[in-house]
A protein has these predicted regions:
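Glycine-rich phosphate-binding active-site loops on the catalytic face of alpha/beta enzymes
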Residues: 6, 82-92, 122-134, 165-198
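Alpha-helix-loop-beta-strand connector modules within alpha/beta enzyme cores
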Residues: 45-64, 83-86, 91-106, 134-162, ...
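Alpha/beta enzyme core
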Residues: 16-31, 74, 84, 107-124, ...
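Short secondary-structure boundary segments
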Residues: 10, 36, 83-84, 104-107, ...
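Catalytic cores of alpha/beta
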Residues: 62-77, 105-117, 149-150, 154-156, ...
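Active-site mouth loops of central-metabolism enzymes
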Residues: 1-18, 98-104
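Short, well-ordered coil/turn segments that N-cap beta-strands
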Residues: 1-4, 28-30, 58-60, 75-77, ...
Length: 203
């Protein structure tokens, strides 16, 4: 299956954020990445504790983001880090997370992240996206180069949707990351069904 990672952004959500999170978790993406890095660490930790419980009840992995201290305090097993943050961790700190993701924007960054212990990568942004307004996407060829360069799973990010799964899968990606649609769509379950239907035709 071509996996979907949900990337959260509470600023886009109209209803209470935890209600949206529960609805997305019930739709069963491969994982939910709690990317609320504008929060102070104490507020992030409080939110993450609730998110971890919601995801646990739904049977969906919850990946914390950026805040290593909060993740360790909560006993989280998975974290996703910007490369500059990953660079600051000791080997012992990295070993605390069996699932350690990193964001990369070049083949060189992908190599470095893997050397620092990353178990999966996100690569992007592949297509134009509202998150990177005004910047052209790096393209599917960039994604293919990253996928070919590293031994770990690579997830495409940036403008990803069911309509471009064939190109992403052909490039070698394990899955894709979705932010805005899952934060704003009327029915996360329907979106996941659309994704899975598209994935079934490309693999």
């Amino acid at each position: 299956m071509f996996d979907l990672l949900c990337i959260t952004d509470r600023a886009l959500v109209r209803e209470p954020f935890l209600d949206r999170l529960a609805a997305v978790a019930a739709a069963r993406p491969r994982a939910i990445v709690l990317r609320e890095k504008d929060l102070p660490q104490d507020q992030y930790q409080a939110l993450a504790a609730q998110a971890l419980e919601i995801c646990r009840q739904a049977g969906v992995p919850c990946v914390l983001h950026t805040f290593v201290g909060a993740a360790r305090a909560l006993g989280a097993r998975a974290i996703h880090l910007p490369l500059p943050v990953l660079r600051t961790l000791s080997a012992g700190e990295r070993a605390a997370f069996p699932a350690l993701g990193a964001s990369c924007h070049s083949v060189e960054e992908a190599w470095e992240a893997v050397a620092l212990g990353a178990t999966y990568l996100t690569a992007g942004h592949v297509f134009a996206t509202t998150c990177k307004a005004g910047l052209p996407g790096r393209g599917v060829e960039f994604l293919a180069q990253v996928c070919a360069a590293v031994p770990c799973p690579v997830y495409a990010i940036g403008g990803v949707g069911p309509e471009n799964l064939p190109a992403l899968a052909q490039a070698g990606a394990k899955g894709g990351c979705v932010r805005s649609p899952l934060m704003t769509c009327p029915d996360p379950g329907a979106y996941l069904r659309q994704w899975k239907e598209a994935a079934a035709h490309v693999l």
